[in-house]
Amino acid sequence: GFDDQMSYINEEFRCLEKVTLVSATEHKEFPNYLSFDQPAVINQLHLSEDPDITFWKFPVRNQNKFERLFDLLCSFRGELSIVFCNFREATESVCTYLAENGYDAIVYHGGMEQDERERALIKFRNGSFHTLICTDLGSRGLDIPEIQHVVHFQFPQSEEAFIHRNGRT
């Protein structure tokens, strides 16, 4: 998504002898905009054999999905949680359902203006809302260590998205 911008930056820093790139995910190949003579992966982080993540699976019929999500979120008793949906419309539907049932949550997706997204994150971080309902936009770049729960209301469409979503905890 940022190939043009990264190509420009790469050209501007051609004079540098060493370039260090950091990524949250491992890639098989370097992006096209990079032209390293001798690329190397240094100090690659490997996940521990015993990560501090517990996965739970709750099979639910589609017609009961909203109700079960509501029950699950209530069981978290105020701990910060993120609920991931695949589409903006789904985030709005989930948030509306929860609000209609007395549960306050806030949405975060790419269809919002930048200032709206920033306000949503501020309200989530400061505890005004304990649940953030978001698209995969929220799976990257959010660093909120207090997040205790990640819920996949809609299962991600790729393994990479699954990894990034769960990385929020």
Specify the residue positions occupied by each region the protein language model found.
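Conserved SF2 helicase motif VI
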Residues: 121, 158-169
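Post-DEXD/H (motif II) to motif III coupling segment of the RecA-like Helicase ATP-binding lobe
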Residues: 1-47
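Conserved helicase ATPase core of P-loop NTP-dependent helicases/translocases
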Residues: 91-97, 102-139
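Conserved interdomain hinge at the start of the Helicase C-terminal
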Residues: 8, 51-100
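Conserved nucleotide-binding/hydrolysis micro-motifs of P-loop NTPases
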Residues: 18-19, 25-29, 47-49, 62-65, ...
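Loop/turn-to-beta-strand initiation segments
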Residues: 15-20, 79-80, 104, 127-131
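A short beta-strand element within the Helicase C-terminal
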Residues: 131, 140-155
